[in-house]
Amino acid sequence: MAKQKFERTKPHVNIGTIGHVDHGKTTLTAAITMVLATVGKAQVKKYDKIDNAPEERERGITINTAHVEYETEKRHYAHVDCPGHADYVKNMITGAAQMDGAILVVSAADGPMPQTREHILLARQVGVPYIVVYLNKADMVDDPELLELVDMEVRELLSTYEFPGDEIPIITGSALKAMECACGKRECEWCKSIWELMDAVDEYIPTPQRAVDKPFLMPVEDVFSITGRGTVATGRIERGQVKVGDEVEIVGLQDKPRKTVVTGVEMFRKILDVGVAGDNVGCLLRGVDRKEIERGQVLAKPGSIKPHKSFSAEVYVLTKEEGGRHTPFFNGYRPQFYFRTTDVTGVVKLPEGVEMVMPGDNVRIDIDLITPIAIEEGLRFAIREGGRTVGAGVVTGIRE
């Protein structure tokens, strides 16, 4: 059977389920596909199919992730669900599954648990901008006051981590009952909570700005000179667009950015009017010598990104089984940090009270690089030793 093609007429949003183990994330994911399938907006994905998620590799790290897609009247969604807690940590830190918003699943019978807190903290750290809550297993709670209490606890917890706890939509229901019923009717006692949840996701999580509409940035992968014409920097445009005559800055590996003008844009030896996010292009740069630009720098819209040496990050350290270190590291650890296209040595400062970091841990650290790199919040990087990946991280703040 030919695969159905999703029409790209609707805005696209990436979301995922987060929350404590056994609170019903995977059941909810299955229930969403079953209810939306009744109106032809999804293909049914059974629980065990989602739970046995395939392994993927991102930045040398193995992560189990299930991907489902579905649509509502308004949008097309790509939804990620992870079987294990460690998979969430890795997923959120590596950005393997970038989330524009998340559905936090909390069991009404248990209330917020340790991983509920940890996932909210991670979402705050790695920049998941919006959260909608599904209060699950409501069929197991007879006392409406208890439901109100859990509702309050969840809102307080979200506010603790600087999410707007009072405004966040909380939908109460039972994913298991909705999955077992799967009639998909909006008036159904169980299926209606799934519709309410999808309405909340549609309304509350805004459509993200497309990469093409953001300020131009292209990591420099290679540089060569064309006799009589000048220097060409090649790379894949990460965001925004570039055309002939645009002023750009060369940022990184130097203390100050350098301005230049793009005098030509080519793709596969053909001249382009404009290069956009996702294109592999060569940019001809005015008055720049072959020696004045190198791999590891970026071309960017002037003023949009600056070179920095000091920043804070949330990192995940690979286990021995994942090919990482066999031993812990301590304050003053000096690995290489791989940003976009290049390795830069840096020194690690551990948080107060943390003596050492073990393989398999995730921790917040401060890093001081020996040379400045174009850095901003949300930028992902790998931690390497001698070309081997030993960790992954995301920039959570700049310290100057």
UniProtKB/Swiss-Prot annotation:
* SUPFAM superfamilies according to UniProt: EF-Tu/eEF-1alpha/eIF2-gamma C-terminal domain, P-loop containing nucleoside triphosphate hydrolases, Translation proteins
Keywords associated with the record = Cytoplasm, Elongation factor, GTP-binding, Hydrolase, Magnesium, Metal-binding, Nucleotide-binding, Protein biosynthesis
Looking at the keywords, is Disulfide bond present?
no
EC class (word): hydrolase
Show the Pfam families listed in the entry: GTP_EFTU, GTP_EFTU_D2, GTP_EFTU_D3
The entry's family comment says: Belongs to the TRAFAC class translation factor GTPase superfamily. Classic translation factor GTPase family. EF-Tu/EF-1A subfamily.
Under the heading PANTHER family, the entry gives:
ELONGATION FACTOR TU, MITOCHONDRIAL (PTHR43721:SF22), ELONGATION FACTOR TU-RELATED (PTHR43721)
In Swiss-Prot or TrEMBL terms, this protein is called: Elongation factor Tu 2
Q: Which organism does this record belong to?
A: Pelotomaculum thermopropionicum (strain DSM 13744 / JCM 10971 / SI)
Name of the coding gene: tuf2
